[in-house]
């Protein structure tokens, strides 16, 4: 039938995928995969062509609920979800509520709506898979953050997994600095008692360039979650690295620009006041609001880099050809963290993300 990948991977199908991810409390990694898939499909600017940070947050906060009681934030596993009908139940309920575009083409040559009609999935069972009308959580599972620590609006929080610390949707904490994940793991092993209530752990130099390769940090987040539960404290974590879908807690990833290229996260110092404000969808370092302090710290960082052959000494070791290629060519997480020579993002046969008449709306909300 001469169906090509670009017939299937379109602006509308990518938007559908993001909405499904929100509705199941999915991994923060969706905001790495989606921009890179969009680029491979010909869209050069994810924010302009597919979905802006502002629209993403509006949908997550006001339109799309979480409709599964699933680990790591809930009770049930993917096996349980599959036993209740799986993803087709979720997609049908989202589509019936007005949240998904059913006109997108699928690999069966049917539209999404035609495919769901043929499969005729059951209604949500109400225990494992909830409905949009009576959701598990009222708001979507993900939130993108801006602010002076994330001017690219790349930072992402898995809101569905937050267990505490957001009184009135605001976290106010003290920065605890760790240059590299191993430094944090060593501290958690040897002296975990140093962490106090409302600490904000900063793990940096783990981004696409700094890692290099943006390594996953499930080990760190799992240990911090255990620490918090055992000591009845709130400890948050922020990093220019990334997390597994299994992470829970107040953890913020993909902060960019990353530390290895001199992003604001590199300029945070021990004890700085860090505010996460979900009313504004921002993460800010209060001392860096002072332009003189920002300039002084940036000059100090640059001096360190200049005295180390152009690379900060805290970056990870690029000891293979692939890792060295990543160090020299990786772009920011907000663009998918892929490798592009000269960090000039390559898009083959670019196309425009023309808007359709479909607008996601929840018929159960006014």
Where are these regions (language model features)?
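Catalytic or ion-coupling anion/metal-binding cores of large enzyme and transporter domains
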Residues: 1-234, 238-258, 263-366
């Amino acid at each position: 039938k001469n169906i090509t990948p670009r017939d299937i991977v379109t602006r509308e199908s990518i938007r559908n995928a993001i909405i499904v991810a929100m509705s199941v409390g999915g991994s923060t990694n969706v905001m790495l995969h989606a921009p890179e898939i969009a680029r491979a499909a010909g869209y050069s600017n994810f924010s302009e062509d597919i979905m802006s940070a502002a629209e993403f947050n509006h949908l997550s906060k006001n339109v799309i609920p979480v409709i599964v009681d699933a680990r790591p934030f809930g009770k049930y596993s993917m096996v349980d979800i599959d036993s209740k009908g799986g993803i087709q139940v979720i997609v049908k309920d989202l589509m019936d509520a007005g949240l998904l575009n059913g006109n997108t083409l699928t690999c069966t040559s049917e539209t999404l709506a035609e495919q769901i009609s043929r499969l005729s999935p059951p209604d949500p069972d109400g225990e494992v898979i909830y409905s949009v009308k009576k959701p598990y959580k009222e708001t979507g599972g993900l939130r993108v953050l801006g602010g002076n620590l994330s001017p690219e609006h790349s930072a992402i929080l898995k809101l569905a997994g937050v267990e505490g610390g957001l009184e009135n949707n605001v976290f106010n904490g003290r920065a605890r600095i760790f240059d590299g994940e191993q430094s944090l793991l060593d501290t958690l092993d040897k002296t975990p008692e140093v962490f106090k209530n409302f600490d904000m752990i900063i793990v940096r130099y783990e981004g696409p360039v700094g890692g290099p390769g943006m390594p996953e940090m499930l080990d760190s987040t799992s240990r911090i979650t255990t620490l918090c539960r055992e000591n009845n404290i709130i400890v948050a974590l922020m990093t220019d690295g990334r997390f597994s879908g299994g992470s829970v807690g107040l953890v913020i990833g993909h902060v960019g620009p990353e530390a290895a290229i001199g992003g604001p996260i590199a300029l945070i110092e021990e004890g700085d006041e860090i505010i996460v404000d979900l009313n504004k969808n921002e993460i800010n370092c209060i001392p860096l609001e002072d332009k003189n302090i920002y300039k002084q710290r940036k000059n100090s960082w640059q001096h360190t880099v200049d005295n180390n052959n152009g690379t900060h000494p805290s970056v990870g070791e690029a000891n293979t050809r692939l890792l060295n290629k990543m160090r020299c060519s990786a772009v920011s997480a907000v663009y998918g963290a892929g490798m592009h020579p000269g960090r000039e993002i390559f898009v083959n046969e670019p196309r425009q993300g023309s808007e359709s008449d479909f607008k996601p709306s929840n018929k159960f909300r006014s």
